[in-house]
């Protein structure tokens, strides 16, 4: 999800130490952990049941998101779940079942047709040779080939010159039914997808206690073989008034999900792509070659893969009214996620040693959040209206994972590794041929633990005069353990102004104008990187010991310590216009924004020739986004039994790569140009003969051709 353009130079998959531009998700007032698990491949957002969501609000401008400070650099999405209403108990149930399939599989020649056209391609394939004057020439006869034999000589007919005689035998044997069979690989890898979705909800209560309980079940069989997603979730919302001035809100949710990825779907997807990219490499004739020859279907159907996720979210809020309009709100929340993975591959998938393998991973993430708010609103002469908020919050995040693997299991029915591992003495198996011993480790294990903390102090003052002139100022101070020793704290201010000019006396004559307001805002928000120890440097155990203790060495993969590695900072400016017409039946919202994000993380190569610590992570890059947003809303039928609301929105964003650490272009990003451009070669037809191919002469007066293929490429900046 990208709010108002690309907010990061990077995308997921480029390492956990960068910002991917993902917004902050807040569920019922509690920030949630939003990430794609490297274990199961599932995103934590998949734990949410859409049927239990009451509303979704997107905070796009800096003023509205500033209260979240260092986590709001990519925008904020507020999700509110359904709550109970006072009155009689209400029950609702929903059930749906659907199916989907590929509209059409790519056409493929098969069997005898493929054999015939493959032969024709071989017969018409030629290879050039280099003449005495240094040019290249295609042979025109077998005699010319014979007279000009070279190390990588010419070829007049690729069929007779092929070095793969087994293919020639298969392609010539038109009477052998084995070579006339046809396999449609796409149909072997895809299926009809089925989706079952069901949920049940109950709500009700009275003025003192209100409740909502919901349960959902979702089961999807993917369109690719051996893929799918299953989820079971329970949500409970409770609101109670145990005392006259005390209100309690509690929420508890529990989710279990299981995702099947088709034996690491990414690798198999690339294999499917290769089938159509080069049909001659993966033929439909049996036996298949290329990726099919590497047992693609066996990996899909015989590999056992379990990707299970467990999540629990709990939040408790106590709101006490000390005096009239003065509220103290205390909240505590827990966000827990655990992902379990087990992958088992049978012996048949190991063509070298015929070992079965089992891999297991457990990853656990927990976030503890405490927030304390003091709010007070008052009016002076019913004209000057104030709303003051003070708060402080504390957050602690922990991440733990362990991973193990084993090989050479007793049989294909045992999918897990015991405490002693698999195999022979000391967990090792001798699979040598007698002349050279080869040992395969039967048991491996690794573990990891991360922790980070965030402390915040913030305040907000809102003022309006007769609901006509509005001013809001926010200030937040955040401190995080992940940043360098010198820059752990940062300040994030914002200011917003508004003028409801429709309330002015001179606008009353425009009876059709229900409401109109001009607004503007400026604010600073931040974003942290994902690796909690990137600024502090890492140590790794050494193989040598001193007095029985293992030594420690700097971890070269983490770079040099940077005590000034700090927040990614975004300055944003917004100007907007809101208009409502004809008793609020038609609404128009128009916005312009400009965002400048600096201090993005970059790996900087250090001067010198130090072998191990030759780079450092620094805040070195900047990008910008600007754009316009238009939203039109029309309530066609508003006060009838059948209601009809129409919405139309339009947006346009322009982004630029503004700055790199060294002042030069960064990889494919060009300073002053949009991010993530698609760049292709510009062509100008085809070469009709070798005489048209550009050439140059070396110092030895040899002719060298600038030739890659038959397509004529247009060269730029060749000087």
For each feature predicted by the language model, list its residue ranges:
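Short, glycine-/polar-rich solvent-exposed loops and beta-turns at beta-strand/coil boundaries
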Residues: 1, 16-18, 69-73, 227-230, ...
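Residues embedded in well-ordered regular secondary structure
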Residues: 1-2, 9-23, 32-41, 85-225, ...
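Extracytoplasmic beta-strand/coil segments of soluble accessory domains associated
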Residues: 1-30, 55, 65-82
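Flexible glycine-/small-residue-rich
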Residues: 3-7, 27-28, 60, 81-83, ...
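A beta-strand signature from Gram-negative outer-membrane beta-barrel systems
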Residues: 50-92, 195-197, 210, 218
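A generic beta-sheet turn/junction motif
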Residues: 72, 204-208, 217, 465, ...
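Flexible glycine-rich, low-complexity coil/linker segments exposed to the extracellular/periplasmic environment
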Residues: 118-184, 276-298, 415-448, 543-558, ...
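Extracellular/periplasmic, surface-exposed regions of secreted and cell-surface proteins
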Residues: 231, 237-246, 251-256, 265, ...
């Amino acid at each position: 999800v990208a709010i108002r353009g690309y907010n990061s130079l990077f995308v997921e998959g480029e390492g956990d130490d960068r910002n991917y531009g993902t917004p902050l998700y807040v569920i019922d007032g509690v920030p949630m952990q939003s990430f794609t698990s490297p274990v199961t491949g599932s995103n934590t957002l998949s734990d949410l049941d859409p049927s239990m969501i009451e509303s979704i609000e997107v905070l796009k401008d800096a003023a509205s998101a500033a209260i979240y400070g260092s986590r709001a650099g990519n925008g904020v999405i507020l999700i509110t779940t359904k709550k109970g209403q006072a009155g009689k108990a209400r029950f609702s149930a929903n059930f749906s079942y659907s199916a989907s399939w590929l509209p059409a599989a790519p056409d493929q020649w098969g069997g005898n047709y493929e054999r015939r056209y493959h032969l024709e391609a071989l017969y018409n394939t030629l290879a050039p040779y280099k003449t005495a004057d240094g040019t290249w020439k295609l042979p025109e006869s077998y005699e010319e080939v014979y007279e000009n034999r070279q190390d990588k000589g010419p070829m007049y007919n690729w069929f007779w010159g092929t070095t793969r005689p087994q293919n020639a035998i298969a392609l010539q044997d038109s009477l052998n039914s084995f070579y006339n069979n046809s396999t449609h690989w796409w149909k072997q890898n895809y299926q009809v997808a089925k989706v079952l979705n069901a949920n049940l909800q109950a709500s009700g209560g009275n003025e003192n206690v209100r409740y909502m309980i919901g349960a959902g079940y979702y089961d999807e069989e993917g369109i690719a073989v051996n893929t799918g997603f299953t989820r079971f979730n329970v949500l409970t919302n409770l609101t109670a008034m145990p005392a006259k001035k005390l209100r309690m809100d509690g929420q508890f949710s529990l989710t279990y999900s299981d995702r099947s990825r088709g034996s690491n779907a990414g690798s198999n997807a690339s294999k499917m792509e290769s089938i159509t990219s080069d049909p001659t490499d993966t033929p439909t004739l049996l036996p298949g070659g290329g990726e099919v020859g590497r047992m693609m279907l066996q990996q899909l159907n015989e590999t056992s893969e379990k990707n299970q996720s467990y999540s629990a979210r709990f939040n408790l809020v106590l709101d006490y009214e000390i005096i009239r309009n003065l509220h103290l709100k205390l909240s505590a929340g827990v966000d827990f996620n655990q992902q379990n993975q087990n992958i088992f591959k049978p012996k048949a998938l190991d063509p070298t040693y015929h070992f079965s393998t089992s891999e297991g991973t457990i990853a656990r993430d927990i976030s503890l959040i405490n927030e304390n708010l003091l709010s007070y609103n008052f009016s002076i002469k019913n004209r000057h209206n104030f709303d003051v908020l003070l708060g402080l919050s504390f957050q602690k995040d922990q991440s733990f994972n362990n991973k193990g693997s084993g090989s050479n299991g007793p049989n294909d029915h045992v999918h897990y590794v015991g405490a002693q591992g698999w195999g022979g003495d000391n967990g090792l198996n001798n699979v040598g041929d007698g002349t050279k011993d080869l040992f395969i480790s039967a048991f491996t294990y690794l573990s990891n633990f991360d922790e980070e903390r965030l402390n915040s102090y913030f305040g907000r003052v809102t003022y309006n005069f007769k609901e006509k002139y509005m001013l809001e100022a926010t200030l937040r101070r955040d401190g995080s353990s992940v940043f360098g020793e010198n820059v752990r704290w940062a300040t994030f201010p914002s200011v917003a102004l508004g003028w409801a000019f429709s309330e002015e006396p001179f606008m009353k004559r425009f009876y059709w104008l229900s409401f109109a307001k001009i607004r503007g805002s400026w604010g600073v928000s931040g974003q942290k990187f994902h690796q909690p120890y990137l600024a502090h440097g890492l140590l790794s155990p050494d193989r040598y010991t001193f007095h029985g203790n293992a030594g420690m060495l700097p971890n070269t993969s983490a770079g040099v310590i940077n005590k000034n590695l700090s927040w990614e900072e975004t300055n944003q400016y917004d100007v907007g216009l809101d208009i409502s017409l004809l008793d609020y039946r038609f609404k128009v919202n128009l916005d312009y924004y400009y965002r400048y994000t600096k201090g993005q993380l970059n790996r900087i190569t250090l001067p010198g020739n130090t072998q191990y610590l030759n780079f450092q992570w620094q805040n070195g890059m900047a990008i910008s986004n600007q754009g316009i947003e238009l939203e039109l809303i029309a309530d066609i039928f508003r006060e009838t039994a059948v209601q009809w609301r129409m919405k139309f929105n339009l947006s346009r964003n322009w982004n630029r790569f503004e700055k790199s650490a060294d002042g030069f272009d960064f990889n494919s990003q060009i300073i002053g140009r949009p991010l993530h451009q698609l760049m292709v070669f510009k062509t100008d037809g085809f070469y009709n003969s070798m005489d048209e191919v550009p050439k140059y002469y070396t110092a030895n007066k040899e002719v060298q051709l600038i030739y890659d293929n038959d397509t004529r490429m247009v060269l730029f900046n060749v000087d």
